[in-house]
């Protein structure tokens, strides 16, 4: 286990131990390592949960990635497995999840997936950590080399919902379900998923 990355990414109290500045440097370091590996501009997906600090951390990560020439594909509020799926489906070079799972609301976290949708290897995490902890001065992208933000979030959500629908192999006709997304990470996609099923869904 590294100094920043624990067993499930980087976690801390948002604004204290997990600051916007740290998120910016994580974005820079991830993009720089991927650029070195790939030899060209990387594409990184970013998904988040609904914690109040997620928008701040997303903006900082995106700024860090773009500042060293990486492109970003924001996925918005979406479950962690969706980030892994869409990273692979969109042929991105990595995916980042902003979430602290079961931790109290004041916490947040940054988890990085590789191009195959799996947890970043210890070796790659170590390289990212080294750049951050050694305060490496990464060359800034200028002019046309600055990274860009990709659009089309709604279409990406739809692609994930189609994937989920394709995994259902039982008859749901006639069921009535009550759905409480509890303002969680699935709250932006679950309603469309249930409405596409042959059942009656009521939402809280």
Region spans (language model):
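Ferredoxin-reductase
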Residues: 31, 38-116
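An N-terminal, well-structured beta->alpha segment
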Residues: 1-63, 67-68, 149-175
């Amino acid at each position: 286990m590294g100094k920043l990355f624990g067993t499930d990414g980087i976690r801390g109290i948002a604004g204290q131990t997990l600051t916007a500045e740290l998120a910016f440097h994580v974005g820079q370091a991830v993009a720089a390592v991927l650029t070195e590996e790939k030899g060209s501009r990387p594409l990184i997906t970013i998904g988040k949960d609904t914690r109040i600090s997620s928008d701040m951390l997303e903006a900082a990560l995106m700024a860090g990635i773009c500042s060293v020439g990486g492109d970003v594909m924001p996925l918005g509020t979406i479950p962690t497995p969706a980030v892994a799926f869409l990273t692979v489906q969109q042929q991105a070079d990595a995916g980042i999840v902003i979430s602290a799972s079961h931790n109290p609301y004041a916490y947040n976290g940054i988890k990085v997936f590789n191009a195959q949708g799996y947890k970043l290897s210890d070796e790659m995490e170590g390289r990212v950590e080294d750049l951050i902890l050694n305060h490496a001065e990464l060359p800034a992208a200028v002019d046309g080399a600055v990274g860009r933000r990709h659009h089309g979030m709604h279409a990406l959500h739809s692609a994930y919902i189609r994937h989920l629908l394709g995994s259902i192999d039982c008859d749901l006709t006639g069921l009535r379900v009550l759905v409480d997304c509890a303002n969680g990470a699935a709250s932006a996609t679950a309603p469309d998923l249930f409405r596409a099923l042959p059942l009656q869904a009521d939402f809280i």
